[in-house]
């Protein structure tokens, strides 16, 4: 998560791609743990309505990290050939390069079981038209009560289209994210705020710790999970029984 404006990193490090370079380096640090796939997601802050602000690239190639960053490199080479001056224009890059933003999430898949199709590769996205209801998630976990967690989703009235562990975790967090949004919406609606104003206030007051605490209360096992919401709040969750390697 870049804590300063994009122009700061261009000025200090001489490159507009400090965030992407760091993500690449951190993913390479886990290169030796085995790869059955890899994926990255990025978030652009402050985008105007109608512009995509979450992007994702996933690969199940033999060298997935290489393929992911080769795709980005190909885009950059085309920009360099056509508009070389744009490589130092952070505003232009943010509006024209999908993977360019202020927040990055990367994951390496080590498939102990399950299929290694692109659909099984993290990060996973739970999309919504409200920024504060968007959820992007990646992680490694070994929870022993997945069947119970899935049944709890059904008891809530949901009808999940998949039974995978990751989708169950995604929807579990998503349920409490939706609840938090509803509570805050009612609060600010009573104060007479417009819907636009309410969306801004929800982003300021969303209680991330409460959402994650409620979601993880019934998890049994080890896990490390990282993610972010569409308005920019990000998190890392580490279970008490976890020894999984991660970098932030």
Task: Locate the predicted segments by residue.
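Conserved short alpha-helical segments that host acidic/polar catalytic motifs at enzyme active sites
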Residues: 1-248
């Amino acid at each position: 998560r870049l804590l300063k404006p994009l122009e700061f990193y261009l000025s200090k490090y001489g490159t507009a791609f400090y965030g992407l370079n760091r993500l690449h380096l951190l993913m390479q640090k886990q290169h030796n743990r085995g790869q059955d796939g890899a994926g990255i997601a990025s978030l652009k802050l402050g985008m105007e309505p109608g512009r995509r602000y979450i992007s994702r690239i996933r690969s199940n190639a033999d060298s997935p990290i290489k393929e992911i960053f080769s795709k980005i490199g190909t885009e950059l080479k085309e920009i360099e050939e056509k508009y070389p001056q744009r490589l130092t224009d952070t505003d232009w890059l943010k509006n024209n390069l999908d993977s360019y933003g202020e927040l990055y999430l990367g994951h390496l898949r080590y498939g102990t079981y399950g299929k290694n199709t692109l659909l099984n590769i993290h990060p996973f996205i739970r999309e919504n038209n409200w920024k504060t209801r968007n959820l992007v998630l990646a992680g490694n976990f070994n929870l022993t009560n997945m069947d119970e967690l899935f049944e709890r989703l059904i008891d809530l009235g949901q009808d999940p289209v998949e039974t995978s562990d990751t989708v169950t975790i995604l929807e579990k967090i998503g349920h409490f994210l939706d609840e938090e949004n509803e509570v805050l919406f009612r609060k600010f609606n009573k104060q007479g705020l417009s819907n636009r104003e309410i969306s801004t206030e929800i982003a300021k007051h969303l209680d991330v710790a409460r959402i994650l605490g409620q979601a993880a209360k019934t998890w049994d096992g080890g896990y490390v999970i990282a993610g972010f919401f569409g308005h920019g709040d990000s998190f890392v969750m580490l279970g008490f029984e976890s020894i999984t390697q991660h970098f932030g």
